[in-house]
Amino acid sequence: MKITALSAQLKNPDRINVFVDGQFRFGLDIRQVVELGIKVGLELDEARLNELELESQFGKLYVQALNYCLLRPHSVREVRDYLWKKSQPKLLKSGRKTAGLPASLTQRVLERLVAKQHLDDYHFAKWWLANRRLKQGVSLRRLRQELAQKGIDQNIIDQLLAESTRDDATELQKIIAKKARRYPDRDKLMRYLASQGFNYDDIKQALTDNHHDN
């Protein structure tokens, strides 16, 4: 079997259609075409074509995952979950079910994102702590829980929380300023603040400082 034509895709000129014996077989990124030595006239057996089809799937999935990472910083666990969903079989409108992607392929995408420094749990956690509900207010306990749920190592969480300039006293004042009108009753407001992860003594002090004595 022989590669008989290469052509840029209309919707994505950076991706190249590869034709084998006059029939479309798969698409590859321009970078993959160069790295894999793909050219018209190249003769390949079925086993090699199957390998190249996996490379095609890898290139497509990597671009999707990269675009996902560029939307905002993500943790490794978030992207692993994203890739898992992308790799599952899908039911087409025709009723046909697509084959899922092998776990080795999604792991390879994840490893490349880490190697290219598009994924870094430390920098993600630092960004999360600096920006999460900055105006609305959030307890450090809630931030700790959120980071743990996103797969961040406990040592990283401890280090960054110790270095953070955010503190519960300031965060409480932010929330009280926004929620006091909704919870005019002091006890109800205290229960709400406790549900957000603040401890009782800090809540009492914050309400006293805020002259919320109803």
Give, region by region, the residue ranges found by the protein language model.
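An alpha-helical, amphipathic repeat domain used for nucleic-acid recognition
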Residues: 1-214
